[in-house]
Amino acid sequence: MTQDELKEVILAVIREIAPEADLVRLEASAKFRDQFEFSSVDFLNFATRLQDRLGIPIPETDFIQLATLAGCLFYLTPKCIQKEG
């Protein structure tokens, strides 16, 4: 999976959790909770759906790394590569 494909998966999951989110103005380094008013339940659903969609286990202790688009890409890219390898 390329980084662009991974980004599309992440954005698709955001759309599911926050359909009103303006993804055109998404800032890669800004926290999702600040940009989309994610509640803690929304964030938990986001992380869980990413795990399901990607087939990659993400320990709860690592959820903090998924707080931004940049963090998601940094954390998930090597895991996707390892899974495919």
How does the language model describe each region?
Residues 2-38, 46, 53, 57-85:
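Phosphopantetheine-dependent thiolation modules in NRPS/PKS and related acyl-activating systems
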Residues 42:
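Two-component histidine kinase catalytic core, primarily the HATPase_c
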